[in-house]
Amino acid sequence: MGDKWIGVALSDPLRILASPLVILRRDDDAKTVENIEALVKTHQPDLLVIGLPVSLNGTIGPQAEKVKAFSGLLSQSLNTEIIFRDERFSTDEARRKMNDSGKNNKTVRDDAAAAAVILQDYLDETNPPCFQP
């Protein structure tokens, strides 16, 4: 969640695969909350996974504090659980995956692709493997 854009991703119903959905322009907080409320109403997620911009040394800096403050506004208006995930290197990983797949920034914006990376990391960590060798 940046100062200008918010990348949004969704998982499939089985919570196996995350895909980029959309990017939202970050206007004033009220308008941004309204846009996220509309997405939540449409897609009805079980929870929101929000990327937290932790500093390289692992500390919570000013940008992470902004994200937490905005998330507080979201939690007041939504009846949806919010989980924070470290978003360090998610944009780099998203760009690598887009390059590997032949997609470029015109096809999928970095922000939405990074949101999918963050969500996929959460899904991989919380869902046990479906198949055992």
Curated annotation (Swiss-Prot):
Pfam families: RuvX. Its main location: cytoplasm. GO terms for molecular function: nuclease activity. GO terms for biological process: rRNA 5'-end processing. It is found in: Cytoplasm. Keywords: Cytoplasm, Hydrolase, Nuclease, Ribosome biogenesis. PANTHER family: POLYNUCLEOTIDYL TRANSFERASE, RIBONUCLEASE H-LIKE SUPERFAMILY PROTEIN (PTHR33317:SF4). Belongs to the YqgF nuclease family. This is Putative pre-16S rRNA nuclease. The lineage of its organism: Bacteria, Bacillati, Chloroflexota, Dehalococcoidia, Dehalococcoidales.
